[in-house]
């Protein structure tokens, strides 16, 4: 079925910033629609998000240039192509852009088109998006990694690490895992309230209280887990996104950037030792960006120290890019990759990164961005790739709930065939 029209438009994301939405129209009248997310802390090797830089509009964050590229460059190039040729369409987008970083058309323009094409194709075939992307062997519902305390660049809280998450690994199914997470979230609200701390939420729906550093955040979560009636380490484990690239400079991890005078300055070896200490002390089973994207030696050391104990997720390190992932596999840096579709710019390249990771024994975590929309594509991608893990925020804000609710629908649709969570053989 051929594409007859592609329309791009400027909409707003969950932070009130402009982003790109794309409609792909087919000759039969079907429309596929996708909206593009945006990150606050971004890896320096991510594909380029095209912004207008016009300070008179949206503080320079407008996306009219990207929208124009959709309507005037991509539309005429793709019209007439079969919507079922996802790989060929994505290859055409890459050729049209002609740069490694997607800086001509903008990764936001390209991704909007790529995802909308997939959604239109699924609608044309009258099958769910996860089934269209993944084929018949798609049945794994992901363990949610719920960001219930925000720090770093995602909040004003004086904590260097960006995210403290809970993982309901002891649940029997996704629905129960979601319930467990919600109950802990509400228990944490009471824990914080009883201490006179703020229960306002950050970009991803987690709380952003003025806690006394990393250990205070972890212990507050453990208290909430127990208050909700669950056993830490058995029912629910803890994951962290350190976002270390945000405070790494000249070989030093400088916690004072976010924590003020209370923060420490740690060398590479001291950073590895600190994370190892935290894993020994608390039920932590996943650490994202424990070392900076430019600290490959540090990543090697961290992997030697903790690689057989916990999941070490590369986000800024790999930026959903097979080139960086290939290096990480070869140099034994990390054992997992975070998947963010807008880091690379097309669905095909995203799936290639996931496939490479799984082929080499790495896990993958399908992820949102801090600036989100009501688009639920990543929920389908998580199931389509049997990744078994999804990171899509806390238990508040509709832009986050949209993904969880889509996963509830998918689990219901799969029925007894659904399996909950990634299990490493």
UniProtKB/Swiss-Prot annotation:
Enzyme active site:
204, 340
One term under GO cellular component: phosphopyruvate hydratase complex
Q: Does this entry carry the keyword Membrane?
A: no
Top EC class of this enzyme: lyase
Q: What is its main location?
A: cytoplasm
Q: In which pathway does it act?
A: Carbohydrate degradation; glycolysis; pyruvate from D-glyceraldehyde 3-phosphate: step 4/5
The keyword Magnesium is annotated on this UniProt entry: yes
Family from the record: Belongs to the enolase family.
Q: What is this protein called?
A: Enolase
Q: Which organism is it from?
A: Porphyromonas gingivalis (strain ATCC 33277 / DSM 20709 / CIP 103683 / JCM 12257 / NCTC 11834 / 2561)
